């Protein structure tokens, strides 16, 4: 089945191998995929893990959102993704800490014996000014996910400077946590 999936993806043998190797590891994985827009990052992850996703969300483009309500719109969209994957939460989270707590609740209701793939696409778009997004992501990873052998968190984005500054070169809670 993995071979059939990989055949649909042309010219990405190394990336496919790396992602499948990470998937097979018996430890928590925080994988960061970044690069220019429209080069197939999202397609690669969705094709490889489409039947293994425990949660998938794509950030809303801030260029098309209006004014002060950007964070609220991002949280509403994240909540919709939680519900789509079976969350029983009754209200839209009012903060990213609440949103990631709702994600933890969703994942804890799922089969803990199988690898849980969490894919957050266009991650930089979720980090609006004063939203506390990076702090909440750090809390999710360090406070919960990093202690779960079955978690594979894949984040993706085309804002390479944001990815580099906030994740790969992070000197805070995500320092040296990413693959």
Annotated model-derived regions:
Residues 1-179:
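Phosphate-binding site recognition
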